Amino acid sequence: MMNMKIVLFSLLLFVIRWNIISCNKNDKNQGVDMNVLNNYENLFKFVKCEYCNEHTYVKGKKAPSDPQCADIKEECKELLKEKQYTDSVTYLMDGFKSANNSANNGKKNNAEEMKNLVNFLQSHKKLIKALKKNIESIQNKKHLIYKNKSYNPLLLSCVKKMNMLKENVDYIQKNQNLFKELMNQKATYSFVNTKKKIISLKSQGHKKETSQNQNENNDNQKYQEVNDEDDVNDEEDTNDDEDTNDEEDTNDDEDTNDDEDTNDEEDTNDEEDHENNNATAYELGIVPVNDVLNVNMKNMITGNNFMDVVKNTLAQSGGLGSNDLINFLNQGKEIGENLLNITKMNLGDKNNLESFPLDELNMLKDNLINYEFILDNLKTSVLNKLKDLLLRLLYKAYVSYKKRKAQEKGLPEPTVTNEEYVEELKKGILDMGIKLLFSKVKSLLKKLKNKIFPKKKEDNQAVDTKSMEEPKVKAQPALRGVEPTEDSNIMNSINNVMDEIDFFEKELIENNNTPNVVPPTQSKKKNKNETVSGMDENFDNHPENYFKEEYYYDENDDMEVKVKKIGVTLKKFEPLKNGNVSETIKLIHLGNKDKKHIEAINNDIQIIKQELQAIYNELMNYTNGNKNIQQIFQQNILENDVLNQETEEEMEKQVEAITKQIEAEVDALAPKNKEEEEKEKEKEEKEKEEKEKEKEEKEKEEKEKEEKEKEEKEEEKKEKEEEQEEEEEEEIVPENLTTEESK
């Protein structure tokens, strides 16, 4: 039930922000009764019916799939038939246009006047941007324009825009009192008759021009003016609702980032405006908006920081941005004089363009840049003033609600100080903060379970819920497709935490403190067709609970004593396989002592954080440090207690720094590698030279051997020849001797 309430509440915010319903001007003349806006129950009933309405008036809304819608449709059958419902939804999405406001001769409240002023400033700013772009294009094509000044369409359009800007500046100078009145008006809620002023503001951009293509230019300008107003309305609703609708809105914006089922698609036409707004740190009262959004979990639940903003805003009485307005008017005089010097010509005669001073465009462009900067500051001041007005309107709605409740109960009308009213408002923020905390934890656990245990395609089909609740039969872990026991323990632990949160959430909503409350183990068997209660039905059904009943218990009490005091059977968590989880989550019924309640609730939050920390540690061990799960878990559960996540830009910077370091290291290693390569080459060359020397020595030795062998052979031959000669001589001598003897 609480989940759907939060979704419905966020739907209301989106309905107010987007301004996406287009209706006829004749229908707008009726408006919506202010009683709807000042009555929380009726307003919530409208949102409920619109949430479950199949033929919804909200463009782009998904078809409802909530099981509670069946009962809601039965309640809203008669309401859907009435024309008042369609008109109310239409005007709720059109910026709180009231019936009294539109029926009383065009009277406007202060917030509407401030919105019209912002629309005018936004169109004025867009005209300056268009003129700057036109001047840049002229400067880039100056050599062509010098040749053809008389019939150059770019130069002609520039002169037209300068004349339009001159008329706007003259109008602002003549109506200084109007601007000062809007900026310095106090946040009263009486309607002021400013019909002529608003008409003059809205019609200033539609003045006719005495030139050719007159009708075409007027049509284009009207179309641009309408788009500008739509963009600014979207921008205003976005910024104002996000910053003024107390901590519920802040937490809902955080929930929209957590839940996958919320509408993540923004209007593409508003991207430029949002980028410009994000670049400026708007302030709400005295405290910056960033301080409200970046508070820790404890301050978010107690609402201390936001209450400081409320008190500071209620204490303010003067206007905002008077210095910015003076600077804006003074700079506008200089722009007007500059434009007057440049545009002293009749646009009907194109030959006058020959005298157009192109050299003075640089000075004009510089003045436009300064003027645009001052215009942004003035727009910021107007937005701050508008936020203060809306915050006071929120406070006044709460006061009127308390008075009406007192009249219905027959009690005297409350007459207390503003501080006491703020404390009452703080109780509502405290209650809503706890409910939103439960919703955020549960949605996060669902996402974690889907991340760790993704469903197969076959499992995505519709499955009976009873079959899902039946315990799985544990098979052998070796079988294919069976989850290990560790996975089952983790999933069961997550499911148990979600069941506990569901149960405590229902207790906070219903405030059932009887001893017959169904424990969490049997809560799944309860009747699901319960009607959705209004935001303050607990107050009506059980007023004594809010003022008298208090249920506290001590840590040292036995379990039976705790059950008697709270009326709820506490269920133990199923312990994890490798971790110890604390035994119980405690439920404290909200009584009338704020300090004790805040301390008890903060203790419960710390216990929930410890439980989630244990689950987180177990999941990290199982997933081996999965970074994606770690980021999601840290951002949505641990808030500021866990390490802050690095943004994408920081990651890119780190990656660039790492790549630069790697490149530097590579560059540093490069000369070392070259020296090693040169040394290796020298070694190889030396080895080659040594091998060649060895070869040469071997060849020399072989040659020497061959020569020695040849010499030995020759010597042997010589010796043989000498021996032969000696033998021949010996043979010759005896023959001679014989001859002599014969004689």
Curated annotation (Swiss-Prot):
GO CC annotation, single: plasma membrane
Location, primary (coarse class): membrane
Compositionally biased region (Low complexity): 512-521
Keyword Magnesium attached: no
Post-translational modification: Not glycosylated.
Subcellular location per the Swiss-Prot or TrEMBL entry: Cell membrane; Parasitophorous vacuole lumen; Secreted
Region (Disordered): 202-282, 459-487, 512-540, 666-743
Range of residues in the leader sequence: 1-23
Region: 8 X 6 AA tandem repeats of [VT]-N-D-[ED]-[ED]-D, residue numbers: 226-273
Keywords noted in UniProt: Cell membrane, Coiled coil, Malaria, Membrane, Repeat, Secreted, Signal
Placement of Sequence repeats on the sequence: 226-231, 232-237, 238-243, 244-249, 250-255, 256-261, 262-267, 268-273
Biased composition, class Basic and acidic residues, residue ranges: 459-473, 672-721
Membrane protein topology class: Peripheral membrane protein
Biased composition annotated in UniProt, kind: Polar residues: 211-224
Acidic residues composition-biased segments: 226-274, 722-733
Membrane-crossing residue ranges in chain numbering: none
Task performed by this protein: During the asexual blood stage, involved in the sialic acid-independent (SAID) merozoite invasion of host erythrocytes by binding to host SLC4A1/Band 3 protein on the surface of the host erythrocyte.
Membership in a protein family: Belongs to the plasmodium ABRA family.
Identification of the protein by name: Merozoite surface protein 9
Native organism taxonomy: Eukaryota, Sar, Alveolata, Apicomplexa, Aconoidasida
